[in-house]
Amino acid sequence: MKVKARFGIIVTTLLLGTTACLNGCATMGMGKTEATKTTAKVETAETGLKQTLAQVDATQASLNSLIEPSQADVKNKFEAYSADVEKTEKMAKQLEKDQAKMQEQQREYLAEWEKKERTYTDPSLREASGQRRAALNSAYSEVPKASTQFQDALNGYLSQVKQIQTQLSLDLTNKGIESITPAAQKALSDGGRLKDTAEPVITAMERVMSEMAREGSGAAAGGQ
């Protein structure tokens, strides 16, 4: 009888352990999935930002070429400039959407993390999880802060180059180009400073991805 009782206890323990493992694995799997999705959104936004900066460089080059004095082939240069302006505007809008999606995913990720955290009965585990979540939340909060200045600078630049495009569409003569040259020079100067305002955004995004990678993404969102 004692043997049977002991055997029953062992079987019960094994079953309970298996159930706990399955539940833990399911939680970990979901944590990894959400962490991967969150990191991917940040990577997409960062890539879009860098591509937008590269497109600004192209717009800068075409504008600089367009305002050269006594040049030939003005029409083709204006068309190239117009195409660059439109492409820059399109990429800026997409970047804004990507950043909004990134922030939405981050909010959902942290909310899910906190929800799982409340189920922990081990105080030390709850504390460790809370510290990791707070570190990520701190990193996340820096991105929109840094993005505001860059977005304002980018929108201001776009407004300038679009107005130059509109004016030249009305008057593409040498005199017309000469008249917008001061505004063009200002746009070129402002565009040249965009990378400076973008640097803190890139740094903030890199910090987020670094925090996500620290100790493995499986440790995030209640993964351990």
Model regions: which residues?
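Bacterial N-terminal signal peptides that target proteins for export
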Residues: 2-11
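Core hydrophobic alpha-helical transmembrane segments of single-pass membrane proteins
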Residues: 15-16
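C-terminal motif of bacterial Sec signal peptides marking the signal peptidase cleavage site
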Residues: 19-24
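Immediate post-signal-peptide N-terminus of mature secreted/exported proteins
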Residues: 26-90
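Long amphipathic all-alpha helical oligomerization modules
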Residues: 30-40, 155-224
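Long amphipathic alpha-helices with heptad-repeat character
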Residues: 42-56, 85-88, 92-106, 143, ...
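Extended amphipathic alpha-helical interaction segments
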Residues: 98, 102-182, 199, 214-215
